[in-house]
Amino acid sequence: MNPVEASASSAEKILLAATDLFAANHFNGVSIKEIAKKSGVNSALISYYFGGKKNLYQEVLNEQSNLFLNLIARVSSKDIAPLAKLREYITAISEVQKLHPHRIHLIYRELLTPTFMCDSFIKNRLYKIHKFMSELVTEAIADGSIRNNMQPTHVAFTLESIIVFFFLTHDQ
């Protein structure tokens, strides 16, 4: 294995371990030592790759939200009806969550117990996800696929809540 591959695998191990630990215990409940132990790397590598626990946490949140933002890009590019896009996006979100159902806890914990990341995370990441769903509902109302007496934001929040509730209570 060359040094670049070794670096990438160590950073990835740290990121995966941190994601699991932050999802289970939130930012303040996780130590650098725990992350190092779970990832099987020296704790100094966390600072080397990520510049410390705060930057690592930021990267974990960004990576999780990137999963959803990438789905938005994929679904947006399809030439299908708005309601079909909405269904496809919801199905894709559910598939991602099925692979890692505990990771929704990461976002949920950030919303319930905000850290230094909360404001920028919500404004820059979560809002884009909500806005996309609201826009699809608006388009589906416009083309007659959804009743016109529905509020797009309310429909989007309802759908988001159903998905989140399912995965928060799944395996409980």
Residue ranges with predicted function:
Residues I104-R109, D119-K123, I141-Q172:
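Hydrophobic/aromatic-rich alpha-helical bundle segments in the mid-to-C-terminal region
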Residues N66-L69, A73, L99, F116-A142, ...:
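Amphipathic alpha-helical packing segments from all-alpha helical-bundle domains
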Residues A17-L21, I162:
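Short amphipathic alpha-helical elements of helix-turn-helix/winged-helix folds
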Residues N2, K13, L21-N55, E59:
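Helix-turn-helix
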Residues M1-S9:
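N-terminal intrinsically disordered/low-complexity leader segments
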Residues F50, R109-P114:
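Short helix-capping/turn signature of helix-turn-helix
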Residues A8-L16, N28-G29, Y49-A73, R87, ...:
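An amphipathic alpha-helix adjacent to DNA-recognition modules
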Residues A73-H105, P152-L159:
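Hydrophobic alpha-helical connector segments
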